[in-house]
């Protein structure tokens, strides 16, 4: 059975993730939330079979998602992580940075203590010679 990805955000980095998921035999982009009409249109070209949700609440409540990719604008990551944490915990890959406001450090610490599934922060371009 293919792993069903839920994608939050499909700008430039989100579209790169969609392309990469398409290359994995046992994975599929199952659901997408992208509020920007232009980015949503691009995402539909890359993942035409995906369900496109019109709100964060709707995608988060989709019980068929096996894992999450949070690829939204940086300042939204913390709020979206907390929203995803309200439903059964599934693995999450969140693009860097994890948070943009030092005052959110305590929120991150609380999230990581309570969240029972793996959480990764993407850093694939940390070193490019």
Regions found by a protein language model. Give the residues of each.
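Conserved acidic residues
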Residues: 30, 64-66
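Aromatic "clamp/platform" in nucleotide-sugar-dependent glycosyltransferases that forms part
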Residues: 73
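Oxidoreductase and adenylate-handling cofactor-binding alpha/beta cores
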Residues: 127-129
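Short acidic low-complexity segments
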Residues: 51-64
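Beta-strand-loop-alpha-helix segment that lines the small-molecule cofactor/substrate pocket
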Residues: 66-70, 78-124
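Short, conserved SAM-binding/catalytic segment
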Residues: 42-50, 107-112
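N-terminal Rossmann-like dinucleotide-binding module
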Residues: 1-47
């Amino acid at each position: 059975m293919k792993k069903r990805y839920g994608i939050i955000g499909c700008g430039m980095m989100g579209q790169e993730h969609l392309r990469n998921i398409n290359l994995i035999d046992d994975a599929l982009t199952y659901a997408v939330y992208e509020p920007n009409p232009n980015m949503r249109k691009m995402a539909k070209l890359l993942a035409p079979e995906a369900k496109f949700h019109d709100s964060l609440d709707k995608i988060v409540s989709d019980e068929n998602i096996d894992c999450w990719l949070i690829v939204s604008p940086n300042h939204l990551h913390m709020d979206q992580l907390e929203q995803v944490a309200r439903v059964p915990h599934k693995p999450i890959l969140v693009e860097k940075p994890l948070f943009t406001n030092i005052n959110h450090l305590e929120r991150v610490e609380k999230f990581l203590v309570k969240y029972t599934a793996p959480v990764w922060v993407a850093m694939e371009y940390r070193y490019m010679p």
